[in-house]
Curated annotation (Swiss-Prot):
Keywords noted in UniProt: Cell membrane, Lipid biosynthesis, Lipid metabolism, Membrane, Nucleotidyltransferase, Phospholipid biosynthesis, Phospholipid metabolism, Transferase, Transmembrane, Transmembrane helix
Protein name: Phosphatidate cytidylyltransferase
Compartments (UniProt record): Cell membrane
Transmembrane segments: 9-29, 46-66, 70-90, 102-122, 130-150, 172-192, 196-216
Membrane topology: Multi-pass membrane protein
Similarity-based family: Belongs to the CDS family.
Organism encoding this protein: Staphylococcus haemolyticus (strain JCSC1435)
Biological process terms in GO annotation: CDP-diacylglycerol biosynthetic process
MF terms (GO), sorted A to Z: phosphatidate cytidylyltransferase activity
Amino acid sequence: MKVRTLTAIIALLIFLPILLMGGTTLMLFAYLLALIALKELLNMNMIKLISVPGIFSALALIIIMLPQSAGDWVSNIQLKSLIAMSFILLSYTVLSKNRFSFMDAAFCLMSVAYVGIGFMYFYATRSDGLHYILYAFLVVWLTDTGAYIFGRLMGKHKLWPVISPNKTIEGFIGGLICSLIVPIVMLFFVDFNLNIWLLLLVTIILSIFGQLGDLVESGFKRHFGVKDSGRILPGHGGILDRFDSFMFVLPLLNILLIQM
């Protein structure tokens, strides 16, 4: 418990100033986190980052995360890079004499999309306003807190025991309820250009998909037989263990709130 608490304090001391600064500093930080998350995901499938598929996956990730504000050429190069990566990885299945399989190639492509889109929206959301990223983090944190408290106090019905045995339906509902505190409080300080009822609806959707994102990563770990995605955060696991909910929440936040 002491290790977990100390890790959280150190992480916050590093993370919060970078989040407040935003800009290029945050973008580079997002790239670093994304590369670590990609490494964690590939490691689950016994694919090393320093390997032919690992290196091409990392290059594709970097391109996928290019800021859309840089111009129309970004979308064009992103599409071409994914097409090129598909051909390269499929060709490598032949060159490796099927030691690197078709399923491995598909896994690399999925990993790049999953991690790249999530972390691209991490810095993109901050660029749209500090209040948006704070809103996202608070929704996820209060959802997690509510799910834990309600699950411990009232949890009797398993939510999805095959994937995550400790999660309960009561915890799921408790997370939704606690997440609603965020918009109610933030509206006193921030104008989201949205009425309270729509913002509450958006919050419920984000809370649901945040918990779904958590279950998706739990599914990855259970499928590959690992407890944590990594060890970089003592007491907490890996980067994916901390950011799994945000992989779903941040893109949805942009679609439902920022781009409306």
